[in-house]
């Protein structure tokens, strides 16, 4: 699987890592992907609306595609800091544009001094089984807004812990 696929395509729960990120971004956000050259064409075909290996990366938050990201985790990424978990560099933020040719060196530099952040990530395919129950719970929050919505005042909920109301 991993030879012809990017780590962000791994499905751990309802969504793949890239789907999970895309669901939590705004339409005004720019998504630029840095992928291995040997899978660049495949990824461009699969994701024609995304910017794959551009010559220049815009300032912003850089997320490792192996991470299981939610909006609260993304909000932890602060200006000009880098973050690692037990699998290595997982995220950083940059205020500057970065050339494609310089990005790998820049990431290595960011990895040398980083803060620890508690983000699950998938290093090996079998890691999915360790985090599957958590990602399913996390993904259900993306699908449903539990008990959010307008109910008629005459409506009475019985066993409301077992009821999902979605907008």
PLM segments and residue spans:
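Terminal amphipathic alpha-helical/low-complexity segments used for targeting or macromolecular assembly
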Residues: 1-159
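Hydrophobic face of beta-strands forming the core of extended beta-sheets/solenoids
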Residues: 151, 165-166
């Amino acid at each position: 699987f991993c030879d012809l696929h990017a780590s962000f395509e791994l499905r751990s729960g309802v969504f793949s890592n890239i789907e999970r990120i895309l669901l939590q971004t705004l339409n005004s956000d720019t998504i630029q992907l840095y992928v291995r050259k040997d899978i660049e064409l495949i990824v461009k075909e699969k994701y024609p609306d995304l910017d794959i290996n551009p010559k220049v990366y815009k300032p912003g938050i850089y997320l490792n595609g192996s991470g299981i990201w939610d909006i609260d985790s993304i909000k932890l990424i602060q200006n000009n800091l880098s973050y690692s978990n037990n699998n290595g560099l997982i995220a950083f933020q940059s205020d500057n544009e970065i050339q494609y040719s310089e990005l790998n060196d820049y990431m290595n530099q960011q990895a040398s001094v980083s803060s620890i952040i508690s983000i699950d990530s998938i290093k090996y395919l079998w890691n999915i089984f360790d985090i599957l129950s958590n990602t399913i719970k996390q993904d259900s929050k993306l699908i449903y807004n539990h008990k959010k919505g307008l109910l008629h005042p005459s409506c009475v909920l019985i066993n409301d812990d077992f009821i999902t109301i979605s907008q």
